[in-house]
Amino acid sequence: MHRFRFEVILATVFLAAFLFANHYLNPGNKLTQAEVDNYISRLEQAPVPKAELAQMIVHMRAWAEADDGKPVYMLNLMRYYPQLLTLPEVAGFQGSPVEATAYDEEHVAPILFGAGGYPVFLGAMQGTLQGTASSSNLMAFDPAVDNGNSVLIIRYPSRSAFFELLTDPQYLKYLPYKVASLLVALSPMTGDLILPRLDWALGAGLLILFLAIAWIRALRRAA
């Protein structure tokens, strides 16, 4: 047993890392009513135009109260405004909507990762027509759904993690830059088929690394 002490310790460390990642990325806890009320109360202070915020609160509360404790994949369909909307929080910003969005994302990314969320897909619309008859779609040409600019899908380990991000004071500090720069359709989705899952990919990587190290050490012993 002493001969394989290093391998046993390494396997224990890797297993602990995998179990931690699995728990962190899949907590499985449902929101309580008290937690929902707390998040909604904090969300009511968000720097979003009042009429839009009121509608958003209704949808957010209903979704939070229907929590199933499972991870959620948040679809962001984004379309830039021709120019920044006039909001007091971004009055001093000198830049385009694209630059304002990049500024927001630069500061929000650490908060997102801290909450356990991470992007699984980001892509720009290719566009099919340009000029005055511009279009991003091959089907469905209603102006309400056409001419999008990009799609982003973010995985959250739980609805609680999403609300932790959304109500974080630092996140709210930069939210006006996103509100002023683009129209976002935010749609929560289930992950019926996602390849690969990050925690299992990590587990596979750790297993391969462990076997490689054990093999190298075995060769050295035999030499």
What kind of region is each of these model predictions?
Residues 2-146, 191-223:
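Short S/T/G/P-rich N-terminal loop/turn motif that feeds into the first structured element of a domain
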